[in-house]
Amino acid sequence: MSVDRLASPDADPGHVWPNSGTDSGFHDGPRSIHAHVTRPIVEQLAKAGAHTVLDLGCGNGWFTQALVRCGFEVLGVDHNEAVLRQAQAQRPSVRFEVMDVMQALPPGLSERFDAVVAIDLIDHVILPRRMVETALAALKPGGLLVVTCAYYGYAKNLALALAGRFDTRWDPLLDDGRVKFFSRANLTQLISEFELQDMHFQTVGRIPMFARSMLVAARSPD
């Protein structure tokens, strides 16, 4: 598994990496978050020696395909059947399945994967513990769970408020968006409830106190 197969964010920002903050609607390319989290996630997967990976909430499948290009065997799942049809049409060599992370794990996926990745999913579900339970059910013993979500810390929240951008982050009028707003303390507390091992935490994108996102990786018991 090679991180070197990832394109550098400096190589071709108009093609490989997004230069827009908008994530609305289906499009074939990466979402803005992928520019920050892809390399750290692949590094965690490589460090764990993972081969089989489940990509929860894969959306248009860009990240799923990026993992395949890095040498992983990947299944991308999402609840949105229409989006997955387009993802499959755009990426015919990548495997996708319709799956609702709020429901029981489908037959055949239990304890099947070396790693489960969920990019910006846990803060978009009403019941985040259920999402974690579904992810852990798919892991082999000793498998790696990698979760990312938007970072919300005191300094960043204060800066947003002073800049007059607070409402853009907590806009109740959006038809879609985050329903949970995690800090480092409550995200790591949530993961700790499941008695996982070797927890790793890092912020990504910008300096730590104003980080774009945060990443938690931890192993299920052997």
Predicted stretch roles:
Residues 147-168:
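Conserved class I S-adenosyl-L-methionine
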Residues 193-196:
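A structural motif corresponding to the C-terminal end of an alpha-helix
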Residues 115-121:
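A short beta-strand submotif of the Rossmann-like class I SAM-dependent methyltransferase core
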Residues 130-141:
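A short glycine-rich, Lys/Arg-flanked "PGG" loop and its adjoining helix->strand segment in the class I
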Residues 82, 126-130, 157:
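Short N-terminal helix/helix-N-cap motif within the alpha/beta-hydrolase-1
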